[in-house]
Amino acid sequence: MRALPTTATTLLGVLFFPSASRSQYVRDLGTEQWTLSSATLNRTVPAQFPSQVHMDLLREGIIDEPYNDLNDFNLRWIADANWTYTSGKIEGLGEDYESTWLVFDGLDTFASISFCGQFVGATDNQFRQYMFDVSSILKACPEEPTLGIQFGSAPNIVDAIAQDPSSPTWPEGVQITYEYPNRWFMRKEQSDFGWDWGPAFAPAGPWKPGYVVQLKQAAPVYVRNTDLDIYRLGQINYLPPDQTQPWVVNASLDYLGSLPENPSMAIEVKDLQSGEILASRPLTNITVTEGSVTGVTVLEGVDPKLWWPQGLGDQNLYNVTISVTDGGNQSVAEVTKRTGFRTIFLNQRNITDAQLAQGIAPGANWHFEVNGHEFYAKGSNLIPPDCFWTRVTEDTMTRLFDAVVAGNQNMLRVWSSGAYLHDYIYDLADEKGILLCSEFQFSDALYPTDDAFLENVAAEVVYNVRRVNHHPSLALWAGGNEIESLMLLLVEAADPESYPFYVGEYEKMYISLFLPLVYENTRSISYSPSSTTEGYLDIDLSAPVPMAERYSNTTEGEYYGDTDHYNYDASIAFDYGTYPVGRFANEFGFHSMPSLQTWQQALTDPADLTFNSSVVMLRNHHYPAGGLMTDNYHNTVARHGRNDPGRAGLLPDAQHSVRPRGQLQRLVPRDPALPGGPLQVTNPVLPAGQRAARTPARVPVLAARGHLAGALVGGDRVRRPLEGPHYVARDIYKPVIVSPFWNYTTGALDIYVTSDLWTAAAGSVTLTWRDLSGKPIASNGGLPTKPLPFHVGALNSTRLYRMNMKQQPLPRHEDAILALELTATGSLPNTDEEVTFTHEQWFTPAFPKDLDLVNLRVRVEYDAPLGKFAVEATAGVALYTWLEHPEGVVGYFEENSFVVVPGQKKVVGFVVQADETDGEWVHDVTVRSLWDLNEGE
């Protein structure tokens, strides 16, 4: 069930022409006939609304799929042109309405609007809702009106702004250009101008719905936005809420029209599943400001079922109906929003004496607490699922979020920039228990801070904070991506004398402006001025800068904020001394090649399916070109050279493949295999609840951006196969795991057990050395032959065993693999039932390139009665065994990138999300392993 976005009368207005009896009429602009034109195109074509120019041109056959081949370059003429959307005659608008408005939920980006041939207004912010009063224009219009929206070329407009002598400039080398320059002058999706993971199409168009709204005096108002804030009594954004306090419901409606004097407000809270009415009562402290009405109530004696992230409990949801009435109890407005009761708090407070006594490292916290409970954040970074939002569907996001849940993830960081997510995406996250750490759309740049710019972005922030605040999946607002952790460092290096000035500019917008705007519109959500910080020293809401950031005021041996780490030098990937230590891993990763199936969707010429083809190389945007050049070979070669695991001596080298396509086919599963090591132990740091030791214990982690990142191919990106990191993360995101932590520089190998349960767990781990033919190694290589018992505390890790591989009595490290098999008992969060947990890990004491791999004779067969796939290796241990499904089916394997030992059959299921083969795809599933990197084709 979806939340009703507006009142029932508003919805009826979309379906019927106005009549004398109806006091409000709303017409969806998507029902009109639209055309698209441009002097560059020299023709007019049919269009849709909402839409974007590229999508209308694609539908009409003017261009082919933008993601194909090098269309990133070939279609730049679209971004360089101005485009006009023109409606047909809008018939049937009423003449007896006092006011007529145009309401646009999203115009991308620089638009000039005309109605009945008259200029109405202009827009310059993709992320704002715009309203224009066209009452006088309509009354003077001699015929049925038409609506025109002209979109200017964003690249040309920001270039002109940059050339204006009054525009700000920054020290040389600070601002980061990916393809189109000057993106910091526009309030538009920053990745539209290119990023290191995707193309630069710079789309334009009416990307969200629009309406004609007609109102009568002293009649129901049109609700254009709603802020529903649910929190504990006394809750403050930056302090942990008292879970014993009753719930507070604060409801605010933004409207068009005129409210009667002394309006009343009330709410009804209904259980979505049972239909039971939990509460029905009036709101108090009614305040009316320009265009908004707000009221509040305390739900004394009301005990709703809590909403929990997936894996921690149920996703209990409620419909809250907010009504506004006049003195005669006549309805003025009514809105229903689906929501949940939960508290979510980002704890950045100093480590307490009690925590120190538990062995927690000193410094400051950086972790989330839901309903008063600390928990491990397990997830990914979410970048735009498509460069063109108008073709992202609910089905698209459902499949993506189903994969998130199947991957044992409970949180996504909504990376900026990106765009603010549509409401239906938050709805899906509410249903599936996925927390969404959201950010304001500022990324990897310094931005203007003049009054006009700040006024523009303030309206953007307020609108979006209020719009999504009712969603229980909303976990955080951050000011932007890497502003503090990267941009301030760059400006300090480029111009040390000006550094204090730019710190002041940063604080002016992200702290002094944004923090109060967040706190004024929500009591339930925490705020951080940047995605990655060292946390704050103090908060004083009466100070000019209300949050005093820590910056570099750190003490050695203490740990503070979250980390953001990229190092593409594969030769030091397992030197864990190179990794940062913090409380939370916010973003990290290792670039990898997509699957061959993905490449086949994007490349129309099979001859381009080679590792070093110009198309493959130029589609790799890391390192970015830094401009509009179309020959970025130097940077792409530099990236491949540094983080190619084969060249770094980690994996077998597939460069010798006889046939170019075979070379590519062997390279593409290789990179996803590598994170099977680093992903488990990247960012070995200490969250609250862990001991003060440098361990691989599970950090609250938003994992490598590559998990869900990248609008690389296909309009429906999630139709492509899931890559290796998703499956590796799924495995290590299980509730209780065993991890080998090997520092190859010292030889130390530590075996840890990590639990994200809220109570202690106990069990045992069996360690077994085998050679690569699968046979046990004599005397178990010096390890105990009996299972090793363990007891691990809540949200904690315990070191089970320590050895030094340089002293371990193994015949040959190149012919050895260690199996780690865990069995444990414990209780899942919010349950008392005892559950048995199992987990399996593997470790090789030599890099895969140096292993004595044998011809495994690995095979896969479909077991029809079971509906699953059986994988066997008859001649040797199959490392990083990889199942791949053919085209024509969409879904994911329940496991992948696993180890198969001779004599042990691996049975793997597959979740089908869409099937165009009538089930025949099961006969074309293929299997490969690390051995295949040694083989030519």
Swiss-Prot record:
Its annotated pathway reads: Glycan metabolism; N-glycan degradation
Q: What class of enzyme is it?
A: hydrolase
List the keywords (alphabetical).
Answer: Carbohydrate metabolism, Glycoprotein, Glycosidase, Hydrolase, Polysaccharide degradation, Secreted, Signal
Leader sequence segment = 1-23
Query: Which reaction does this chain catalyze?
Result: Hydrolysis of terminal, non-reducing beta-D-mannose residues in beta-D-mannosides
- State the source organism's domain of life: Eukaryota
Any Pfam family from its record, for instance, is: Glyco_hydro_2_N2
Q: Which residues are glycosylated?
A: N42, N82, N250, N285, N319, N329, N350, N553, N612, N743, N796
Which Gene Ontology BP annotations are present? glycoprotein catabolic process; polysaccharide catabolic process
InterPro entries the record matches: Beta-gal/glucu_dom_sf, Beta-mannosidase-like_N2, Beta-mannosidase_GH2, Beta-mannosidase_Ig, Galactose-bd-like_sf, Glyco_hydro_2_Ig-like, Glycoside_hydrolase_SF, Ig-like_fold
Any Gene Ontology CC annotation? extracellular region
Protein name (record): Beta-mannosidase A
Q: Which gene encodes it?
A: mndA
